[in-house]
Amino acid sequence: MSATPAKYTFLVLIDDHTDADALSRRMSIRQAHLAEATRRRQAGILVSGGALLDSHERRTMVGSSLIIRAESEQQVLELLRADPYAVAGAWNLDTARIYPYVEADF
């Protein structure tokens, strides 16, 4: 019997803060966020992720979408809190929406 806990998949939508400096905070920490995302992807935690945009024309980043494999919603919250975007104050953690998620098999 395996000691590894079952993992579940979650879809996360999280908005950035909306103050005047929010986008500059996001951009200043972006490389650290991407490095952490790469590490989490290699570890099998992050399935997919990307920026939410205000529009396709303007392409201003206003938040993030993530598909995360974790043991629980609580673990997802812990992962979000430790992300460079959250630590630097780019993400507004109060807006995080976490949904149980199943990918279509087609």
Q: What name fits each language-model region?
A:
Residues 1-106:
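Conserved, structured core segments of small domains
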